[in-house]
Amino acid sequence: MTPDQPDSDRTRIQPPSGANDRTVAFDSTQAYHAPPPAALAAPAPVASHVDSGEGLPIGTRLGEFELTQLVGVGGFGVVYLSTDHSLQRRVALKEYMPSSLAQRSGTMQVSVKSERYRETFEAGLKSFINEARLLASFDHASLVKVYRFWEANGTAYMVMPFYEGKNLRDTLRSLPQAPDEQWLRTLLLPLTEALQVIHAEQCFHRDIAPDNVMMLAGTQRPLLLDFGAARRVIGDMTQALTVILKPGYAPVEQYAEIPGMRQGAWTDVYALAAVVHYAITGRTPPPS
């Protein structure tokens, strides 16, 4: 199936006046500030030079975690495949690194590019940590599990299982025909259960779409990805990258401040229904 619009296409709009990050429903100013574990406070030596616009060198040690592969670099963070030498397992390690606001200066240390970016950088950092703390509190097979998180080197890190699989968009494109009812039920039941878990804590995803659902290799169980709390906080504060929406999956209340409309659990339900539309028809729904 070939959809009429790539799911990675997003619309960038100005946030509503007074908008706050509600991806994770807590006060983003109340961040976790416990000191990093002793093993992480003094990382092992690394290469003498680190490129300011790239990830850390392969082989870098952050306590018991050794970076073995650069998985992805985005506008707000870097993800590495890593080895946990304490528990002898592969993990994914995510580093908060908003490239438009921060840089490295030849070391592991992350610093803001300019003092005028500091407030925005720190707000995103707090949101990143709070998201990690919230995800660490959840226990559902269709939600990303965070093993641990900490602050060091002027930034923050979170460690998660290394999940393997394809996103839902690519999975659907590989099917010889549209999925049947049983396939859709198998997809939807775990996702609706996962949403019940996060909604019970007044947490809203706000970015559900086919490319934010991974179908895990082997089990084909769906996994909900990318809460993106730091991205939205930075967008709200800069009003440049602003709130990022995927047309067709975002309900009308996400586009602007409309009297009588607010975001909530129903925002995610709309997006999930739009995902079902895509799965059945192979086409992105019309924008709300």
Q: What are these language model-derived features?
A:
Residues N153-N167, T171:
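Conserved short submotifs of the Hanks-type protein kinase catalytic core
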Residues F149:
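Activation-segment/catalytic-loop signature of the eukaryotic protein kinase fold
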Residues T68-G75, V79:
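Protein kinase glycine-rich loop
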